[in-house]
Amino acid sequence: MLNFNTPIIDTKEYSEIKISEIEPILKINLRGKSRDFVTKIGKELSIITPVDPNTSSSNEKLNLLWLSPDEWFLYSNDKIGIKDANFLENKLFNEISKVKLGSVTNVSDHWIMINLRGAIIFELLSAGCPFNFNNFKNSKGAVTPVSYTHLTLPTILLV
């Protein structure tokens, strides 16, 4: 069973930045290449599947991030019960994995989400990463996978 518990219960505040963990929520990795796969995701989630690099889409309950031409990251806006999380995962598994359109992997207990707020966020992120964040400063919902020296962060979502 997935572990939705978190060891982090603290928020750190500094003069120009605030760091906190987002309460554990549903996170699912989706992989597939066919047009049928992309269409099925949109239909099952009632969300437009982003197909362009560095984009995301959302509805009132879910967010879907483009990670690569054949990979997406789905997460819930709010904490949802284990019963609802299992229902959504099983629904996607039955409609995608069972019919061999792609893969559905629940990564809720593998990844954490950290909320960074403040006036110097882009400067902080740019300090250890070669990615140019200037194009993202005015873009809502932009995403990018980034690497920091010996640490790989799967995705940064800017909202």
Q: Can you annotate each of these PLM segments?
A:
Residues G42-F73, I80-I96:
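A glycine-rich, hydrophobic loop/mini-helix early in the fold
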Residues M1-N59:
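Acidic, proline/glycine-enriched N-terminal capping motif
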Residues K18-F37, V107-G128:
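Short glycine-/aliphatic-rich beta-strand segments at the starts of folded cytosolic domains
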Residues I41-S56, F122-S147:
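Internal amphipathic helical hairpin motif
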Residues V99-S108:
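Conserved short beta-strand edge segments in small beta-sheet-based binding/regulatory domains
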Residues N77-I82, A119-I121:
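Helix N-cap motif at beta-to-alpha junctions
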Residues T149-T155:
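Conserved small/polar residues in nucleotide/adenosyl-binding loops
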